[in-house]
Amino acid sequence: MSNIEKGHEHQMHSDADSREFLSFVLGDEHYALDIMSVKEIRGYEKVTKIANAPAFIKGVINLRGDIVPIVDLRLKFNVGEATYNEFTIVIMLNVAQRIVGIVVDAVSDVIRLADDEIRPPPEFGVAFDSRYLLGLVAIEDHMVILVNIERLISSDELGLIEQQTETVQD
């Protein structure tokens, strides 16, 4: 059985007791987020830098008239090298009625998970704050970290992004 077929074993649940997640890779780790927050997946493009922004906020882009902040999760989670080339991926998300782009190394698959497959997040042993986690799930021979994207791109950070993108538009 191929790796893709094994991954789809998790999709045997009815729609009522499961949710779909988009899985992606950062460094050597596998992550996933609720697919309902995904707007589109794009290649990385040049950003307009924002003065005094945290290092993980790379800047903003103009996406069909919307000014969209770009957050590099590799820097936010402190995993992997932050290189930007034609293979760099940006996942555009709808978070708190705002479009935000997140930079990842690769997008893997869509996985359907039942609530009982999701294990609670550990209080230690991960590279970032466990408040950003929905939980963990074992798929094939690795663990997938489920990210709470609304909490990760917190209202405080979105407020900072909002304030600085207004400055860019002026």
Question: What are these language model-derived features?
Answer:
Residues M1-D170:
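An acidic, low-aromatic, low-complexity terminal/linker signal
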